[in-house]
Amino acid sequence: GLGDVYKRQWDRTYRTPGEPLDTVMPMAVLINGASASAAEIVSGSLQDMDRAVLIGQRSFGKGLVQSPRELPYNGSVKVTMSKYYIPSGRCIQQMDYSHRKADGSVGAIPDSLTSVFYTSKGRPVRDGGGITPDFKIEEPETPTMMFYLVTDFLLTDFVAEWSQKHKKIAPPEDFEVTDEDFEAFKQYAKEKNFTYDRQSEKLLKNLKEVAKFEGYMDNDSTIFNSLEAKLTPDLDRDFDRNKDQIKKLLTSEIMKRYYFQKGELINSLKEDDVLDKALEVLGDPALYQQTLEAPGKVEKTATL
């Protein structure tokens, strides 16, 4: 039909200049929420063809193609022209721009409206939400306090002073922040009168207002007072509670100052749950093959 003719006009076939170097070597691809567009197409295609295992967190979900168009008075606009589809037939787009809410905002495609597709060996995969890894490694929650440590430049300023007392440090693969360094940073935060908001404290304030409006405050005020005491920021307590994450932030800042981005990356690989899982899977041929096998018979699989 006419539609097929139109589609063929836009078909493009690209070929590599030579034969592939290796078609059987086990591969693991690390992805997370920052993996978008081309990264998702490559990782998703490898998953669809059962050529690699994917490890990490769900990818971003950018499956639309935009083309810029010139406008008068040196203006320009990007127009969505097409969508990305990968070998199984699924689209990786997460945000549904075809259906807008009353206020004009858009939301992600709910899981209930996604469809099942199949890899070349028959493994079920879904569309509409980026690429879901074969092994999910959840990232730890980041407390609000961490955000303020970075945005208030407290880390940067402390490391600038710290570096004046430490002209040389261990190489990236060996360096570790000591407990003494951690305590020094905590003391520095106190001296600089470091303050931070906590979402739990704000939510409690809203809850108290609702309880007062509904008449519960008079009978249960002691409960709210107890909660308020527990949720009031306490620098010593919160520093100690988040010690491991704060030490990681310190380490990252120190590495960037002494060894730049390369050193920071080398050091971070010492404690990387996603990388550790990749090494585990690649080191276990049985687990690797089992991951790529289909759970049962299916009707249609991915093809190139």
Language-model features: where?
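Conserved functional hotspot residues or short segments at active or partner-binding sites
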Residues: 91-92, 96-304
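Signal peptide-directed extracytoplasmic domains
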Residues: 7-12
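Polar, glycine-rich mid-to-C-terminal structural blocks
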Residues: 38, 50, 55-57, 61-123, ...
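Generic structural motif
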Residues: 34, 84, 138-140
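Mature extracellular/periplasmic domains of secretome proteins
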Residues: 14-21, 44, 69-70
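Active-site loop and adjoining helix of the penicillin-binding protein/serine DD-peptidase-beta-lactamase fold
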Residues: 19-37
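Extracytoplasmic/secreted envelope proteins and their assembly/folding machinery
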Residues: 24-27, 39-43, 47, 52, ...
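Short, small-residue-biased leader/transition segments that mark boundaries at the very start
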Residues: 2-6
